[in-house]
């Protein structure tokens, strides 16, 4: 082989080996680099730039503190203050953000409107509330995560399932009073049983008889007051006639011990008879005087033997008295005097 051909083959092999070595070194470097070391693109969200201004509500509070007035600060003055102090604020979005900030300030009790203000929304004027009078409303708790809510929600249905069990227990408890209500009905049946017998009916007529017996003494008690009525005069007349008869009988008896006689008193006493007779005593009896009274007969005398004629005389005396006819008592006395004269 010619020497020139050998040299050309050596150079071609050296160039191929160098190319393979460079490729292997490049592959080794690529494998040694970490996968996440590549810089993320702008679409994935680059690092946020720092805020160019504080929250709008804080800026509003600063504006109100800077320009405190008696009647409050207008919304236009607040907006001018914010744009001058924080020029980086977007003027186009500021109107919307300012409206939200004022609403939240009123809700939290940080801002108030003047007394006579009737404005609404992002209009009118506002004032700061003093720190002493601020009322911080309770903050709302953070909403639960969906996983936690799913884990706790199933417990609520279990509680709701327990409630029907409680209602069943309440129903069972309500049945017991019904049984108790049914139990008192048994004494009612026992009350009905005695009605069949006659023992319960006996006390009622007995009570009726007792009432009748109690009424009878009332009538008897009412009888004595009637003595002073129209029938009382007839009874007094009967008593007077009986006394006159007893006097005449005593005078006719031969075995009388004394010439004096005592006047027998009735239930109401002899003075009643004297009052009724009054000045109607006949002259013959008045002439005899008190000494002409008949002697008192013994206890077994004949005053008791003549109940029949006395009853008849009493019945006769009940009739109407005529002015011209003398009383029977005077007739009986006259007859007794004739008998004495004949004796």
UniProtKB/Swiss-Prot annotation:
Per the record's keyword annotation, is Protease included, yes or no? no
* Ranges of residues in domain H15: 52-130
Tissue localization of expression is: Oocyte (at protein level).
Q: Where in the cell is it found?
A: Cytoplasm; Nucleus; Chromosome
Q: Where is the composition biased (Basic residues)?
A: 132-142
UniProt xrefs under CDD domains: H15
The protein's GO terms of the molecular function aspect are: double-stranded DNA binding; nucleosomal DNA binding; structural constituent of chromatin
**Where is composition skewed (Basic and acidic residues) in this entry?**
150-183, 199-219, 235-247
Q: Which UniProt keywords apply?
A: Chromosome, Cytoplasm, DNA-binding, Meiosis, Nucleus
Q: Where can the motif Nuclear localization signal be found?
A: 161-176
Q: Where is the composition biased (Low complexity)?
A: 1-32
Q: Which domain of life is it from?
A: Eukaryota
Q: InterPro entries attached here?
A: Histone_H1/H5_H15, WH-like_DNA-bd_sf, WH_DNA-bd_sf
Q: Which parts of the sequence are annotated with region: Disordered?
A: 1-50, 122-343
Bias (Polar residues): 253-265
**What's the family?**
Belongs to the histone H1/H5 family.
The protein's name is Histone H1.8
What high-level taxonomic lineage is stated for the organism? Answer: Eukaryota, Metazoa, Chordata, Craniata, Vertebrata
Gene symbol? H1-8
